[in-house]
């Protein structure tokens, strides 16, 4: 069953049970591309905008109070997720997001008219353009929704997830603060380090990334709403931009404000590019963490084998008993995806022409995917890898005892050249540093035992 809806192009048949109208139906028919639906976070952000706009327009005398109440009620239902199935459009549409903006306008109007006792859909008493979209353009509403969706996702999903992973690593770092092992640079043996110190670097890297993400947020809080079509604010009443930003801030609990330059807010997306760059920095840190733990857990008999990674599942379909570092692999793959998303976002943001960037849907799609992947990745990695991480203390001690770079502690006492000679002799003859040093006669047993003490080589100020 269908009903007839109209727009400026004429009439079109719409499924009878759909809340959307003519423009959404045309988009469905004309843009059957891929399966990437517009993220619901964007839909819900647009619904929040429509609710806030109805309230502000009511206060400013731009809408009849009864129409404003109907819009608010319908928008609240959308925000609650009650009509998610009525937003079927894909990302691959007009670059301004107009089709999705109209999808939201039509669904809210269609539901509002039903609430008023009329048949589903239609344009009376609530019109999707004249009432729901009052004082707005897709050109300012969609970028505003992009900022709202991104900021909410960072606060609600990503920051708590970073805190979980950072906390898990910090706990492991504290637990193993005195477990001495071989440090490595260039993948070669270096001077000693504790396992706790090694893990503390991961915590600090996450902290740098988190601070970069938080530093990007103030610009994301600046909203394009009120700029309307080209940034001038045409057809928006005086004071609308500040009023709707305040309304959105109150509803969301985040400090949104009106962007100081609406022309830039429509034509460019620097705040989201900066946020994406910060997300990439987190991906870089996660890649490092995953790769390091994968190396340390390599083996169990022919690798580093210093760390036992939790076994989440059998690792091979052909090699019985094999366990693979699957959590590290999953985390590193999603880090790659985030880096790729950042490249897409950067290129898309560079393609604004004159007064409008028309790559908005692909920007927000990739940005929200990055946030979701990073949040899920941090939580999953902490729960299924970091929490169950077990260092092999005996293996660490064995490798440390055999390490040649302990000779570095002798530098202040016998000089670099003699210390290097000891290391080369020990390596060439397969003997210990102690034996090589004594054979060369550069020091006696007591001196070696006093000066070469790994547990005292862990901080500045030690000279053996």
From Swiss-Prot:
<protein>
    <recommendedName>
        <fullName>Fumarate hydratase class II 1</fullName>
        <ecNumber>4.2.1.2</ecNumber>
    </recommendedName>
</protein>
<dbReference type="InterPro" id="IPR000362">
    <property type="entry name" value="Fumarate_lyase_fam"/>
</dbReference>
<feature type="binding site">
    <location>
        <position position="185"/>
    </location>
    <ligand>
        <name>substrate</name>
    </ligand>
</feature>
<feature type="site" description="Important for catalytic activity">
    <location>
        <position position="329"/>
    </location>
</feature>
<comment type="pathway">
    <text>Carbohydrate metabolism; tricarboxylic acid cycle; (S)-malate from fumarate: step 1/1.</text>
</comment>
<feature type="binding site">
    <location>
        <begin position="96"/>
        <end position="98"/>
    </location>
    <ligand>
        <name>substrate</name>
    </ligand>
</feature>
<dbReference type="InterPro" id="IPR018951">
    <property type="entry name" value="Fumarase_C_C"/>
</dbReference>
<dbReference type="InterPro" id="IPR022761">
    <property type="entry name" value="Fumarate_lyase_N"/>
</dbReference>
<feature type="active site" description="Proton donor/acceptor">
    <location>
        <position position="186"/>
    </location>
</feature>
<dbReference type="Pfam" id="PF00206">
    <property type="entry name" value="Lyase_1"/>
</dbReference>
<dbReference type="InterPro" id="IPR005677">
    <property type="entry name" value="Fum_hydII"/>
</dbReference>
<dbReference type="Pfam" id="PF10415">
    <property type="entry name" value="FumaraseC_C"/>
</dbReference>
<dbReference type="GO" id="GO:0006106">
    <property type="term" value="P:fumarate metabolic process"/>
</dbReference>
<comment type="subunit">
    <text>Homotetramer.</text>
</comment>
<keyword id="KW-0963">Cytoplasm</keyword>
<dbReference type="InterPro" id="IPR008948">
    <property type="entry name" value="L-Aspartase-like"/>
</dbReference>
<keyword id="KW-0816">Tricarboxylic acid cycle</keyword>
<dbReference type="InterPro" id="IPR020557">
    <property type="entry name" value="Fumarate_lyase_CS"/>
</dbReference>
<dbReference type="GO" id="GO:0005737">
    <property type="term" value="C:cytoplasm"/>
</dbReference>
<feature type="active site">
    <location>
        <position position="316"/>
    </location>
</feature>
<dbReference type="GO" id="GO:0004333">
    <property type="term" value="F:fumarate hydratase activity"/>
</dbReference>
<feature type="binding site">
    <location>
        <begin position="322"/>
        <end position="324"/>
    </location>
    <ligand>
        <name>substrate</name>
    </ligand>
</feature>
<comment type="function">
    <text>Involved in the TCA cycle. Catalyzes the stereospecific interconversion of fumarate to L-malate.</text>
</comment>
<keyword id="KW-0456">Lyase</keyword>
<feature type="binding site" description="in site B">
    <location>
        <begin position="127"/>
        <end position="130"/>
    </location>
    <ligand>
        <name>substrate</name>
    </ligand>
</feature>
<feature type="binding site">
    <location>
        <position position="317"/>
    </location>
    <ligand>
        <name>substrate</name>
    </ligand>
</feature>
<dbReference type="GO" id="GO:0006108">
    <property type="term" value="P:malate metabolic process"/>
</dbReference>
<feature type="binding site">
    <location>
        <begin position="137"/>
        <end position="139"/>
    </location>
    <ligand>
        <name>substrate</name>
    </ligand>
</feature>
<comment type="similarity">
    <text>Belongs to the class-II fumarase/aspartase family. Fumarase subfamily.</text>
</comment>
<dbReference type="InterPro" id="IPR024083">
    <property type="entry name" value="Fumarase/histidase_N"/>
</dbReference>
<dbReference type="GO" id="GO:0006099">
    <property type="term" value="P:tricarboxylic acid cycle"/>
</dbReference>
């Amino acid at each position: 069953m269908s009903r007839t809806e109209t727009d400026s192009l004429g009439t079109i048949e719409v499924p009878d049970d759909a809340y959307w109208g003519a423009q959404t139906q045309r988009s469905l028919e004309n843009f059957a591309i891929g399966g990437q639906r517009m993220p619901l976070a964007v839909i819900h952000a647009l619904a929040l905008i429509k609710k806030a706009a109805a309230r502000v327009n009511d206060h400013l005398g731009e809408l009849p109070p009864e129409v404003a109440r109907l819009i608010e009620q319908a928008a609240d239902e959308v925000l609650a997720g009650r009509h998610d199935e009525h937003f079927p459009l894909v990302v691959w549409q007009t670059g301004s997001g107009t089709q999705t903006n109209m999808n939201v306008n039509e669904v809210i109007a269609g539901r509002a008219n039903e609430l008023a006792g009329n048949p589903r859909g239609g344009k009376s008493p609530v019109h999707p353009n004249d009432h729901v979209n009052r004082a707005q353009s897709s050109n300012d509403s969609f970028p505003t929704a992009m900022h709202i969706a991104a900021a909410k996702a960072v606060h609600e999903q990503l920051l708590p997830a970073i805190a979980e992973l950072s906390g898990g690593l910090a706990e492991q770092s504290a637990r193993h603060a005195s477990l001495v092992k071989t440090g490595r640079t260039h993948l070669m043996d270096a001077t000693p380090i504790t396992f706790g110190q090694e893990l503390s670097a991961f915590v600090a890297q996450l902290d740098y990334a988190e601070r970069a993400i938080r530093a990007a947020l103030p610009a994301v809080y600046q909203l394009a709403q009120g700029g309307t079509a080209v940034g001038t604010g045409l057809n928006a009443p005086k004071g609308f931009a500040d009023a709707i930003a305040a309304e959105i801030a109150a509803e969301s609990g985040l400090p949104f404000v009106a962007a100081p330059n609406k022309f830039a807010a429509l034509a460019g997306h620097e705040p989201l590019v900066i946020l994406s760059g910060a997300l990439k920095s987190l991906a870089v840190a996660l890649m490092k963490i995953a790769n390091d733990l994968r190396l340390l857990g390599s083996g169990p008999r022919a690798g580093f084998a210093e760390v036992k990674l939790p076994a989440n599942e059998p690792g091979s379909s052909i090699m019985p008993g094999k366990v693979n570092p699957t959590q590290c692999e999953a985390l590193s793959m999603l880090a790659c995806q985030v880096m790729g998303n950042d490249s897409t976002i950067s290129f898309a943001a560079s393609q604004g022409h004159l007064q409008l960037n028309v790559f908005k849907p692909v920007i927000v799609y990739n940005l929200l995917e990055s946030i979701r992947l990073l949040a899920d990745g941090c939580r999953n990695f902490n729960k299924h890898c970091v929490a169950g991480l077990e260092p092999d203390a005996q293996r660490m001690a064995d490798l440390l005892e055999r390490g040649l770079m302990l000779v570095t502690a002798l530098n202040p006492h016998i000089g670099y050249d003699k210390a290097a000679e000891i290391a080369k002799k020990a390596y060439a003859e397969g003997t210990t540093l102690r034996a090589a040093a004594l054979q060369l006669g550069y020091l006696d047993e007591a001196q070696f035992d006093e000066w070469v003490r790994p547990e005292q080589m862990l901080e500045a100020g030690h000279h053996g």
